[in-house]
C-alpha cells in the first residue's frame, strides 16, 4: 500500500464564527483576512456544526486524540492524569507503521501509576501524550520556545512572560492596540512554523504524520507588529450579552460564579480587575487583537502550505484544520472557555483530502464532534477505529455524503471543579464530583443537564444566543423531559466498551462486534 501524508493542524482557542469562509456563505463580509485558510476551505470540506466535546485544553485534547468523550477518558481538567489504558492516536499510528511527530503540545498529565510522584511532569501544566515524538514542543513551561528566542539573540526579561506585555508598558489594564514586546520573527507562531519546516525538510519527501500545534489565538491578547494594528476595534462585531453582568448572572448559579470570579489577568498579561466589566470598546479592541493573532497564524500556515506545494506534496497530503476549543471573547460577559455557551464549544473543522475534491469548497451542515478526528485519520491511512472510540470517521462526508444513520444531536461536557478561578465547587456549594454538566443540542433546542444544579433549556430558533432559560416553563415540560431522556440514553449507549465484544467459549476467546 502506498504510504500517505497527514498534516493535523490544531490551533488554540479559535472559535468557529471567526472563519471567513463561513461568513461569506452566510452573506456576511468577513472582518478578518485568512487567505491560506480560505484556500484550504476552497479545496476541502468545511464543517459548520462542529464542536469540541469538552473544555478546557487538556480534556479537549484528550478527547481529540483518544476519540473518547470526557465521561470515558476522565482527564476532566487540566493537570488531571490521563489513564494509561486509553489508546490514543499516536499509539494507534505507531501500530500501523507511522512515527507520529508532534509540534506544539497536548497538555497531558501522565498516569501516576506508571511513574514516581516525584516525576517532574507533575510540576507543570502538562506534557506530551505517549505515542507522539516531539519535534518542537512547547512544554514543559514553554522552555523550548523561550530557549529558541534567547538563542536567536533576543534578550528575555527577568520574568520571561513579560515579552507579552505591550511595547513600552510595565502594566496593562486590559485590551490594547499596542504591539507585543516580542517581534513577529520571534513569536511563538513563528517558532512552531520554523519547527514544522525543519521537520518536513528533514523528511526529504518521505511519508509523514505531523501534528502541528499553535498556541494562538490563545491569551494573552497582545500581538506582535504589524498584526497588532491590522484590524480596527470599530470594525469588530459587538459582544452578544445581557444588559449588564448582574442580568447575565441571574440565569444560573454557574454563570453567576464566572461573572463574579473571572479575572482580566488571565487574558491580558499584568492586568488586574474583573473580566466581566470590560466595556464594549475594550471588547472590540480585544477582538481586533484576536483577529491579528489569527492572521499571523494564517501567514505561518502559508509558509507550510508553500513548502508542500514546492515539493509536490500538497496533493498527497490529508490536511485537517481544527482547534481545541473556542473563546467567549466577551459574549455573555465572559472570557475564556467555560460554562455551556456555544462560543466556548463551537470550533473550526476543515478537511482537505489528498487528491479527492468531490466536495471542494462546500459546507457540511451535519453534526460533527472532535472525537471524530481520530477515526477519520486512522481510516484514511488504512487502520481500524478502536472499539472503545466514541467517534466515527468523517470520510463518508468527503465521498458520498452524510451517512443515513449519522448522529442527530451534538454532545459536549464540562467538568467545572477547580477550573481557573476560585473553586466553583465552593461558590455553588457542591462536592467536586458533582461539578459537571452535559449538553444535548440539535437544530431546534439545547438542553444542559447538571449533576447537582438546575437544568437549562433553550429554544434555539427563537433564542439563538441562549438568554431565556425555559427549563421551568410548564409549556416546555414535555420537551425538557424528552431531552433529559436523550441525555441519559446517550450516556448509556456510550459507556466504555473496550472489552465488551469479547466472549469466552468452549472454542476459546471469541469476539462479537454487532
UniProtKB/Swiss-Prot annotation:
A GO term, aspect molecular function: metal ion binding
Keyword Transit peptide: no
Post-translational modification: The conversion to 3-oxoalanine (also known as C-formylglycine, FGly), of a serine or cysteine residue in prokaryotes and of a cysteine residue in eukaryotes, is critical for catalytic activity. Phosphate triester hydrolytic activity is retained with unmodified cysteine acting as a nucleophile.
Record keyword Zinc present: yes
Enzyme class name: hydrolase
Domain of life where this protein originates: Bacteria
Amino-acid positions noted as binding Mn(2+) in the UniProt annotation, renumbered to this chain: 12, 57, 324-325
pH-activity note: Optimum pH is 9.0.
Cofactor remark: Mn(2+) is probably the active metal ion. Other metals such as Zn(2+), Ca(2+) and Fe(2+) can also act as cofactors.
Residue positions, PTM 3-oxoalanine (Cys): 57
CDD domains cross-referenced by the UniProt entry: PMH (cd16028)
Uses in biotechnology: Has potential application in plant genetics as a heterologous conditional lethal gene useful for cell ablation and negative (counter) selection.
Residues at the catalytic site: 57 (nucleophile)
Activity regulation (UniProt): Anions including Cl(-) and CH3COO(-), and SO4(2-) salts stimulate activity 20-40% at 100 mM.
Cofactor section: Mn(2+)
UniProt keyword annotations, A-Z: Hydrolase, Iron, Manganese, Metal-binding, Zinc
The enzyme's E.C. designation: 3.1.4.-, 3.1.-.-, 3.1.3.-, 3.1.6.-
GO cellular component terms, semicolon-separated: cytoplasm
Functional note: Hydrolytic enzyme with a broad substrate specificity acting on phosphate diesters and phosphonate monoesters. Hydrolyzes phosphate mono- and triesters, sulfate monoesters and sulfonate monoesters. Hydrolyzes glyphosate monoesters. Does not hydrolyze DNA or cGMP. Hydrolyzes glyceryl glyphosate, but this substrate has a much lower affinity than the glyphosate monoesters.
Stated family: Belongs to the alkaline phosphatase superfamily.
Complex formation: Homotetramer.
Listed name of the protein: Multifunctional alkaline phosphatase superfamily protein PehA
Amino acid at each position: 500500500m502506498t504510504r500517505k501524508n497527514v498534516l493535523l493542524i490544531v490551533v488554540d482557542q479559535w472559535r468557529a464564527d471567526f472563519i471567513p469562509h463561513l461568513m461569506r456563505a452566510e452573506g456576511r463580509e468577513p472582518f478578518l483576512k485568512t487567505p491560506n485558510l480560505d484556500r484550504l476551505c476552497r479545496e476541502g470540506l468545511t464543517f459548520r456544526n462542529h464542536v469540541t466535546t469538552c473544555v478546557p485544553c487538556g480534556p479537549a485534547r484528550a478527547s481529540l486524540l483518544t476519540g473518547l468523550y470526557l465521561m470515558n477518558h476522565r482527564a476532566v481538567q487540566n493537570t488531571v492524569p490521563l489513564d494509561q489504558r486509553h489508546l490514543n492516536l499516536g499509539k494507534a499510528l505507531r501500530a500501523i507503521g507511522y512515527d507520529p511527530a508532534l509540534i506544539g503540545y497536548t497538555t497531558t498529565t501522565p498516569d501516576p501509576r506508571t511513574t514516581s510522584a516525584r516525576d517532574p511532569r507533575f510540576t507543570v501544566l502538562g506534557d506530551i501524550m505517549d505515542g507522539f515524538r516531539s519535534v518542537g514542543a512547547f512544554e514543559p513551561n514553554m522552555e523550548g520556545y523561550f530557549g529558541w528566542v534567547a538563542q536567536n539573540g533576543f534578550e528575555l526579561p527577568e520574568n520571561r512572560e513579560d515579552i507579552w506585555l505591550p511595547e513600552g508598558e510595565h502594566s496593562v489594564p486590559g485590551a490594547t492596540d499596542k504591539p507585543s514586546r516580542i517581534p513577529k520573527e520571534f513569536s511563538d507562531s513563528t517558532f512552531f512554523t520554523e519547527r514544522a519546516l525543519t521537520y518536513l525538510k528533514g523528511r526529504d519527501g518521505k511519508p509523514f504524520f505531523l501534528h502541528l500545534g499553535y498556541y494562538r489565538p490563545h491569551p494573552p491578547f497582545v500581538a506582535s507588529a504589524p498584526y497588532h494594528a491590522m484590524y480596527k476595534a470599530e470594525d469588530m462585531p459587538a459582544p452578544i450579552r445581557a444588559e449588564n453582568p448582574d442580568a447575565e448572572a441571574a440565569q444560573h448559579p454557574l454563570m453567576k460564579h464566572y461573572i463574579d470570579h473571572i479575572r482580566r489577568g488571565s487574558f491580558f498579561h499584568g492586568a488586574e480587575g474583573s473580566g466581566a466589566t470590560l466595556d464594549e470598546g475594550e471588547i472590540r479592541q480585544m477582538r481586533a487583537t484576536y483577529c491579528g493573532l489569527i492572521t499571523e497564524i494564517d501567514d505561518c500556515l502559508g509558509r507550510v502550505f508553500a513548502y508542500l506545494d514546492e515539493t509536490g506534496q500538497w496533493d498527497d497530503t490529508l490536511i485537517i484544520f481544527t482547534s481545541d476549543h473556542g473563546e467567549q471573547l466577551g459574549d455573555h460577559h465572559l472570557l475564556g472557555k467555560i460554562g455551556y455557551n456555544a462560543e466556548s464549544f463551537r470550533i473550526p473543522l476543515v478537511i482537505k483530502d489528498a487528491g479527492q475534491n468531490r466536495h471542494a469548497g462546500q459546507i457540511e451542515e451535519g453534526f460533527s464532534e472532535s472525537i471524530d478526528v481520530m477515526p477519520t485519520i486512522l481510516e484514511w491511512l488504512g487502520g481500524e477505529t478502536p472499539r472503545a472510540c466514541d467517534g466515527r470517521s468523517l470520510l463518508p462526508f468527503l465521498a458520498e455524503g452524510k451517512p443515513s444513520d449519522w448522529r442527530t444531536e451534538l454532545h459536549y461536557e464540562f467538568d467545572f471543579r477547580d477550573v481557573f478561578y476560585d473553586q466553583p465547587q465552593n461558590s455553588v456549594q457542591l462536592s467536586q464530583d458533582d461539578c459537571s454538566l452535559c449538553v444535548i443540542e440539535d437544530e431546534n433546542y439545547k438542553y444542559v443537564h447538571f449533576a447537582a444544579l438546575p437544568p437549562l433549556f433553550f429554544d434555539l430558533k427563537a433564542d439563538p444566543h441562549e438568554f431565556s432559560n425555559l427549563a421551568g416553563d410548564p409549556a416546555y415540560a414535555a420537551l425538557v423531559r424528552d431531552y433529559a431522556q436523550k441525555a441519559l440514553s446517550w450516556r448509556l449507549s456510550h459507556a466504555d466498551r473496550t472489552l465488551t465484544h469479547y466472549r469466552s467459549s468452549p472454542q476459546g476467546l471469541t469476539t462479537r462486534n454487532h
